[in-house]
């Protein structure tokens, strides 16, 4: 992460204070955190019935207040995620938290649609599913929780979160803060809840629970597969491998800036981060020069061969061609390249190999 500045130190202090304030005994639902799936779903269902009965204007007020509170907490939650998971870049997590807080659509997406004609009038009004079960990943715990929350409650739903076990503390902190903001604005308690000790088993229980009407999953292939077999509607986001295509019409300086910004964002742990670069042959040298001018490290074939031995150091699992070294996931290029004897600073955000 590099040297701590005054802002970082202040966030650490806020984090510790908040942590001490939240130690109020065992989870039992008073803060939206439940020890078992059934209790969480039952409380969430009660809250959803109250929530869906409120006027749409009240939803707007609550969501506006929630956004305000989440903006205030963006830095502390970013620190919490970085501290617990050890993945990505703290400063990028702040930007990510603010992005989903400000840009996730709210009730403005619920506009009714009407058709009229010779056969009469048809009115389309969107209705809530009810209780939604959401499985969140270790790579994107805070932003996924915020995004899911705003979108789901805007539609009149409630949500039960099952966090990745390696991100349970920061996800719990987010859920508690969300619940407090909703109640402050006049919404019902337990509209957004979580599982105190999330596991693979609790995730499976949540996906198959008769009290949930929809499953939302953000994660790897295995959890997505389970969700698709759960017997109910599922919205799933799995692994991503997005390409960048650069041709001779591109502004190469701008392209280089965008490539580094997108591919290095939060150390490429987001599925939508660009991961492949395809370039028209006639401009390769010019684009490489533009990337190097922005401190991008271009690896040689020999360096890549050494790096592959570090990145794919784990035994391959069944059905996989290679085993990924999990210790390298989400780390700065400086930490990864150090493993093969290349020393660069943390200001090097991206390394590219052909």
Which role does the model predict for each range below?
Residues 4-11, 32-42, 54-61, 65, ...:
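Conserved active-site and cofactor/substrate-binding residues in soluble primary-metabolism enzymes
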